[in-house]
Amino acid sequence: MSPERARQGTTALHDGGPAAGAGTTEQTPPAGRPGAPVPSVLSLPAPAVLAALESSPRGLTAAEAAARRARHGPNELPAASHGHVWRRLLAQFTDLFAVVLLVSSAITFLAYWLERPREPATLQLAVAILGVVLLNAAIGFAQEYSAERTAESLQAMVPHICRVLRDGERRELSARDLVPGDVVVLEAGDAVPADCRLVEAQEAAVNNAALTGESDPVTRIAEPVPPGPPLEARNCVFMGTDLVAGTGKAVVLATGTATEFGRIFRLTAAAPRQRTPLQRQVAVMARRVAGVALATGALLFAVRVPSGQPFVDTFVFALGVMVALVPEGLPATLSVSLAIGVRRMARRQALVKQLLAVEALGSTSVICTDKTGTLTQAEMTVVQLWADGVPHAVSGVGYAPDGEVADPAPVRELLRTAALCSNARLVRTAGRDAWRVLGDTTEGALLVAAVKAGLDPAEEESRAPRVAEYPFDSERKLMSTVHRDGDGTYFACAKGAPLELLTRCEAVDRGDGRKPLTDAGRRGVIAAADGMAGRGLRVLAVARRQVSGPRPPISDVESELTLLGLAGMYDPPRPEVRDAVDACRRAGIRIVMVTGDHPLTAEAVARRVGIVRETAPAVATGTELDAMDDSGLDALLTGARELLLCRVTPEHKMRVVTALQRRGEVVAVTGDGANDAPALKHADIGVAMGASGTDVAREAAVMVLLDDSFASITTAVGLGRSVYRNIRKFLIYLFSHNIAELVPILAATFTGFPLVPITAVQILAIDLGSDVLPALALGAEPMEPDVMTSPPRPRRERLFSTAVMGRILFLGGIQALGVCAVFFWHVHASGIPYADFTRDTPVYREAITMVQAGIVVSQFFNALAVRTDRQSVFRAGLLSNPWLLAAGFFGIGLMAAISYAPPLQAVFRTAPLAPADWAVLAAFGALLLAAEELRKWTLRRRSPAPKGGRP
């Protein structure tokens, strides 16, 4: 049998291959894969597995490995493709606003070419519009490119190096050079570089959390096993997982995308990337604004052509109206505002890879969170010991041996025995004041407790070296070791599940000697163990006995034992998580735990962090989800106030996310393993762990938590809500002045005035000069105190809600009335007939200058007014956003330069204003602010402030 055929058969286990069912010895390769049916490698002995893959205990030859490398390709997943740089740059010009402006610029260039004589103002307009598009595209591209580069700096393919047998020699190779048939050497602490079948195993255990979400170590053996689900095959190890205990040799079955990791990668690639709420709202807004602009321009063109105006002039006029209605500064303002949110989140340890995801966080209504590493510290910790009927508290959290054991003398022998009966190692991270465990985390927790009691595990091991080991297995639920004491005698150490170990004990250590274990004593031990388990602790019993020699039968080692006591441990919650969960409740955000762990473990953690408060929360396993149709799942998600989903697969997570989205929820999903990646990509907001997360998870997510803390999500949600509020503020600010630009043009058209009250170049000066900085300052408004006490906004809520449109019309209407008044007052006061006005008439130039200055001054007061929705701006503090004041004064200063500087007067056809003119405009702006304050006061009187929060 060729190795390629063997590989194709064995790597399709999840597709119903050799592990698909009992009694199956052959399989048909999946569609599109070459190869004939092959025997299941799960049920073959090790020599037959090597033979099936045309390998040997000496590994492959270098020549054969090179041939297979050419055939199968590198052992890596395809790099994420963000597209060529130029394509992403061109994508910036596909926005509807950009398309409308590009077309407008092109038509204006054409109009300038057709004009006789050619007007410099027309060319200025065409160039200015094109410049707007280029500026917006540059800002948007720069922000996205910067975020991508930052995210890519986190990527680290693990493992880079592995040990492999080639030509009978052990070599260190890059993991990407592995091929099917290679024999790899694994030791505790190694990351598994490919999907492999073990051919040798000594006390091997793996952590499959990256694939299954289950954080408990799983024993692995080299013996044949019956066909079954691939991830449950006890003689296989998989890419992306870690060997936490023991050693072994394994033959590579699958590499790259043919691995289980690759299967999840393909599932992730097939999952559609959801558009954020803001993307949907901006798209709707762009279509509507573009439609209104085109319709208005066409209407005015149709009205003015019959009046005898030159065709080209009328066409340019209609384009000017369209330009007046399109908020040219909006894309740049939106991009920079979101970028400010990105920077604020990054300072809080949340890296956002896509700008638009910032706002989407603010609309999150459901968070589907995993458990280990996000809610907890992923560091098992012994918190209670029990010996001779007395509990002993253990202080300190995590792997750092900081803390102490209350009254350590009675439990020293318990902890010494537990430390000897362990394969884990406690090491300090180089260059950092941090500790980590190499090996099983449960054994690591016992080592830390031993150090806290004043013991040195390495010294104890040297005093009583191990001479034999009887590994843990799922039937005995025990692990035992034999040691030689300093006087030449031998003793056995055992640890395991309390009930199983208790049946093998005949005595108990009372501190003053070995006493018989009576029925009452057994009941006391069971009660103590049940009490610890009821608190959500994982409980182990520890025992020992004298033995006759270095390698006695296991029946002698694990009988007539003396019970030393119990150890209770747990993975402690992150200290900040409970407050973060409470903040989510106040904000009306529902939290659903979705984990691969056991239901009892999940519920215990959920209670500690405050996710569960009810006596009987709803708990569903992956098997139960499989039995539900969509209506049943909808009923579960709707009816359960507190919900825990346990023992779930990647497919289950995607189905749950889809069901929640179907109900109108905006869903954020957290995860760190490859098994989380499909749901991370399918969610509205995928949140991956930066420190402990896999590359696949980080690539699928749009936000990466650099500190792996759930509390950072809550902070990011608050910042996201603040960003949305700020976006709404500057939208009101920008669109209200569009009304002030459009209404005078309409008024002039329908009253027969031959010229426009404000030119297109003046409009661009306002949109891109005077208005941009105040809009940016509004986008940088600090987070308001009540931002996390309101319910999430509905998924289908329009960006331009009735309330927002009402404020735009209210403020824009006041501005429009004011600038119309000053324009027509100047025109009528001159006594010049409408027909005699030309572009160079001094009164006309003064009038259009008053219109432009009126909009600029009123926008300064408008910016102050929109800072708050209900609260008086005077209560919020006029000086609380100094950037806004500076931006407003800059805009007024720019307007003054346009009015008084001769070069700018020539460009904008303006005239100098008298001090009295400025006073009139300032009074008009103050009137606008007073009117908005009166509106807010009326709103506060009529209705109390809304309050949110879910129970």
Regions found by a protein language model. Name each.
Residues S770, Q815, I848-A863:
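Generic alpha-helical transmembrane segments
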Residues T749-T759, W825-A847:
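Helix-coil boundary and interhelical linker segments in multi-pass alpha-helical membrane proteins
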Residues C820-Y834, Y900-Q905:
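Membrane-helix interface motif
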Residues F750, R807-F824, G854-V857:
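Alpha-helical transmembrane segments of multi-pass integral membrane proteins
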Residues S830-G831, R867-Q871:
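Active/binding-pocket-proximal capping segment
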